[in-house]
Amino acid sequence: MDRKKAVKLATASAIAASAFVAANPNASEAATDVATVVSQAKAQFKKAYYTYSHTVTETGEFPNINDVYAEYNKAKKRYRDAVALVNKAGGAKKDAYLADLQKEYETYVFKANPKSGEARVATYIDAYNYATKLDEMRQELEAAVQAKDLEKAEQYYHKIPYEIKTRTVILDRVYGKTTRDLLRSTFKAKAQELRDSLIYDITVAMKAREVQDAVKAGNLDKAKAAVDQINQYLPKVTDAFKTELTEVAKKALDADEAALTPKVESVSAINTQNKAVELTAVPVNGTLKLQLSAAANEDTVNVNTVRIYKVDGNIPFALNTADVSLSTDGKTITVDASTPFENNTEYKVVVKGIKDKNGKEFKEDAFTFKLRNDAVVTQVFGTNVTNNTSVNLAAGTFDTDDTLTVVFDKLLAPETVNSSNVTITDVETGKRIPVIASTSGSTITITLKEALVTGKQYKLAINNVKTLTGYNAEAYELVFTANASAPTVATAPTTLGGTTLSTGSLTTNVWGKLAGGVNEAGTYYPGLQFTTTFATKLDESTLADNFVLVEKESGTVVASELKYNADAKMVTLVPKADLKENTIYQIKIKKGLKSDKGIELGTVNEKTYEFKTQDLTAPTVISVTSKNGDAGLKVTEAQEFTVKFSENLNTFNATTVSGSTITYGQVAVVKAGANLSALTASDIIPASVEAVTGQDGTYKVKVAANQLERNQGYKLVVFGKGATAPVKDAANANTLATNYIYTFTTEGQDVTAPTVTKVFKGDSLKDADAVTTLTNVDAGQKFTIQFSEELKTSSGSLVGGKVTVEKLTNNGWVDAGTGTTVSVAPKTDANGKVTAAVVTLTGLDNNDKDAKLRLVVDKSSTDGIADVAGNVIKEKDILIRYNSWRHTVASVKAAADKDGQNASAAFPTSTAIDTTKSLLVEFNETDLAEVKPENIVVKDAAGNAVAGTVTALDGSTNKFVFTPSQELKAGTVYSVTIDGVRDKVGNTISKYITSFKTVSANPTLSSISIADGAVNVDRSKTITIEFSDSVPNPTITLKKADGTSFTNYTLVNVNNENKTYKIVFHKGVTLDEFTQYELAVSKDFQTGTDIDSKVTFITGSVATDEVKPALVGVGSWNGTSYTQDAAATRLRSVADFVAEPVALQFSEGIDLTNATVTVTNITDDKTVEVISKESVDADHDAGATKETLVINTVTPLVLDNSKTYKIVVSGVKDAAGNVADTITFYIK
């Protein structure tokens, strides 16, 4: 039977079954058919889903979309058929079947308004169809680039982001992360990447058009902004459009350059009456006005950039500094020469080097003008008149017979000077004042025949006067006021709130808004206005140009409304818009302001008042971006977030935790579930903050690697109002309105097994210690195995048995002898994570000596070495091969003679060694090849080598004597290094380093820290006594002048070297005030007799705690109490810190917050363990003062036998913060 017939037969059977069920609802066979059809339909739903999901998951590729459609259509048909069959069959299970079908259908196939995880196949089809449409756009854009079609490229450049922004949410609805990621990476990411690669190209093209349009519209600021972006981006365009865009940009830049180059638009001239005259008829005392196309920078307008030359001979005309000035708006240059021009002469004014406010230079240009032969007024003077011109008149009464003198630049014809041509008129009434006018040479004298009225305005007019040569004298008018005053300021500008500005200082905190309001501090300010009163009434028409509000930095005049109250002589200034916040402004009252009598304020009375507006705008968070995205962040990598604010901040620090104490900053990284109103120390993730150089208000928030956890959500919180330390602006006046929260998630659960990455020799993770070749070892040798990730340390994951030893035989690698054993211990890295294991060769079987061995990490499916997620190491990793046996130096001693007899204890030792002794070196290997002088190197403290010979003892093959060529120095520490010795089979003897000290000369007293006869000595000051060499038991006494002994102190032997001693007063104990004391030190240091070395001193009133805690002694600790060592020695014989913890006793209570202890194996010249501050414990002191530091009561540290270790303790301090000296001692 073929497949089609089978399908038809199955369909017919199903229909028949449906009919039978309808007639026989209780028939078991019918029920079985319904269940089968329902089950088959559900299977088809899942098959349609698996068609895309399994293909993507297993192959990493998309299935043929036609296959997905086919299975999708089958699923829809199966659903319809199954629903019809269930409805026809009816029965008790009808509703359950229908509900089950609907649920499965809507989950896997289709639903009208699906939620996340529903309608999986339909959603995939929609997403795939959209993605292919997006890919078609990408291909069109790619083709445009290949064809170098810039117009088409720009078209699709804009289309693609619109699609991505408005429709790629379809991709996010697809069920299955693998499928979503493949859709994004294949279609969305590729389209975005291609589009983004053209960002500079399209921006240059758009900005070039913007320049052209802005230039045409006269918006040069907009054109300049676009030009700046073209210059920034043009070097970054792709090769595809570089040629075309370079040409496009050039055209735009040329258009901008032509429009932006400022220039002198026109030149005009006026006479002394402020009337315009032709440039061909300029009077000798005329004034030039140069009108500019743009506001000039005042600093560039001067007599060097505006110059005047005689045209004939190009001879410069001398101008004084004050002759050239610039208007307030910066657009008019006035040239008013102090020296008159020559009559009937042609001049030119040359402009060169002037710049606008943006630094752009004006076009160089020249303009000619010509002087006429008419006579002009050069001076007007008298003792009784004040006026508004540059002529020389003074204030005072003006009586009958007083005179006014007018001087011209040429001789005048006397017959033309009379009371008809020279008049004085009352401005108010028009009445002529009787005068007598006479002339002498070029001067007209006007004699009053009637007194002028104080405060009244008069007009002097001269008309129809001629020169002796027949030329006209200029028509001249002068309005003046008899005995008038300049309009000086009576009350400086004052705000509505009552703040009065002043000259010479900046007034801050001025409310800058037109409407009244309250700042963040809660202070109310009325609206913005300034009132100023004057000593006289004003000419209101002169206010606009001479009473101005200016933004200081830009020089821009602020549009303002001026109101004048003549009765109150008050000017009110109100800006037409709110002022900029946090900005300096100036109110300028300029010389051109006139009184109602026409009297000018004058330069001497000009005023400038400066004020700064309040900052009222709270900062906002513009954006938070993550360097690695906001989802799936890797916990083993450092993460970086960029936070950008709307303005600069006062401060921006990370929140930190010390123990359970939280120190709040302005930002914190916390766990997703943290309650921001009640954060705990465990909620906060360590983070750091750094400002981004060159970017205002921008900061980097950094989280180090391994601080975050897998499969977790987190918040980056920028704190606002209500927080302990909210974000504030740079003025510290305004606060971020509310908390800003940025969320992100980390990568999912770890399913990757750990692997071995490196092996290091010793307890080390330094690259210098990495094992790359065969290496000699012996029992006690350590290796550090580094793994690819953090390891589990519980349930025996890192214990013995996890690493075994094998040796190489003729039959290959076999288990090492039973006596060869290893131990395994966890090791933390710099981030406090266990990412390594320290393997110690705890035993070495005799049969394995001189064999080649290897370490093997054994796999185990259930309890092998595993990461923190429980993934067990999969491979049986061979780590390293090495020779097992390493011979060592047994000891180095001082020998009395060359036969090695009467030797001292083994070095190192503080016992004084005679300077004539030889050194006896003993090896534990009897079959040595040779020991040469270069194998035994002895050096003094300065590093100078000691010459000597090496000989073997008679009958001995492992004992050698080093005999110095000269006697050693007294009281000197010598180091001994034995290296390079080999046995006869080629094994290298382990390098060995030790030291000894020679006997010292008789010691002397070097110094006492308090001078003899000192006064005002600090009553708590530590007293230091120093000897030239070791003095084990000096006798030191302290007593008052009356003989009363003072013993409430501890005599501290600094560093236990018997050379420096300190008298440290007991806690809370001080010397008496203003009292004389005597400090005595015995001359015979061993017997304590004959006390005659002493100082006397007198105390003051001061007693400060500047005393560092001092080491009192080194001893042992039994868990509850401290026992001082009997001998003052730095050499202790200790097997391990667990059985025999070492205790250090200090002179006072100590604080170990920053204390550190390092342990160095000086035999092998390496640091073998660093004990953190948690491993030193002051709480074990039996008393409450905590004076004892106990080493290794928390972290066990077993030491190697026969090795010498150096212990260094640093960072111990007392309650006052005084840090103790670093302490060094040795154990073996």
From Swiss-Prot:
It comes from the Bacteria. One of its GO terms (cellular component) is S-layer. It is found in: Secreted, Cell wall, S-layer. It holds the Pfam family Big_5. Gene3D superfamilies: 1.20.58.770, 1.20.58.780, 1.20.58.790, 2.60.40.1220. Keywords: Cell wall, S-layer, Secreted, Signal. Residues 1-30 form the signal peptide. The S-layer is a paracrystalline mono-layered assembly of proteins which coat the surface of bacteria. This is S-layer protein. It comes from Geobacillus stearothermophilus (Bacillus stearothermophilus).
